Regions:
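Key DNA-contact positions within bacterial/archaeal DNA-binding proteins
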Residues: 36
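Core alpha-helical elements of the protein kinase catalytic domain
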Residues: 13, 43-44
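Residue cluster at the C-terminal edge of the helix-turn-helix DNA-binding motif
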Residues: 47-50, 78
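Beta-hairpin "wing" of winged helix-turn-helix
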Residues: 49-64
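N-terminal helix-turn-helix DNA-binding core of bacterial DNA-binding proteins
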Residues: 1-33
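Non-DNA-binding regulatory cores of transcription-related proteins
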Residues: 64-138
Length: 138
């Protein structure tokens, strides 16, 4: 998993809490990253219809989705998050050994199941839930 999901949730909570448009610079300052990284992640959220951009003096990003119904699963999907992933596979499918030739397929199925479990869990948590948790523990 990369940091896109974390950044997206952070930005959406900021936008929800502020109730107004925020620039990529303002979001980056709160998230503690650079504006270019923010813009890259926000592009996925915009494409998914969660935010819109506005030009001008009070321009920036504005939350268009209802934070009370916007789930973390939807956010994860918008930024193409895979929670469990493995770029390297052990073994060799062309070998005669069952372990050597089958391990990658078995582990890939395990990773898919784990991602499905994560997505199911996140479908019950909204942006408002995260915002509420933050201010309950203040």
């Amino acid at each position: 998993m990369d940091s896109s999901f974390n950044l997206a949730v952070h930005a959406l909570v900021c936008l929800s809490h502020s109730g107004r448009s925020l620039s990529s610079e303002a979001l980056a300052e709160n998230i503690c990253t650079n504006p270019t990284r923010v813009r890259r992640v926000m592009a996925g959220l915009k494409k998914a219809g969660m935010v819109e951009t506005r030009e001008g003096l009070d321009g920036g990003y504005r939350l268009t989705a209802d934070p009370a119904s916007l789930t973390l699963r939807q956010v994860a999907e918008a930024v193409n998050t895979r929670f469990v992933d493995c770029a390297w596979h052990s073994g060799d499918i062309d070998r005669d050994c069952v372990i050597c030739s089958g391990m990658a397929g078995v582990l890939d199925a395990l990773y898919r199941s784990m991602n499905e479990e994560c997505a199911a869990y996140l479908s019950h948590i909204t942006i408002t839930d995260i915002e509420t948790q933050l201010f309950e523990h203040k």
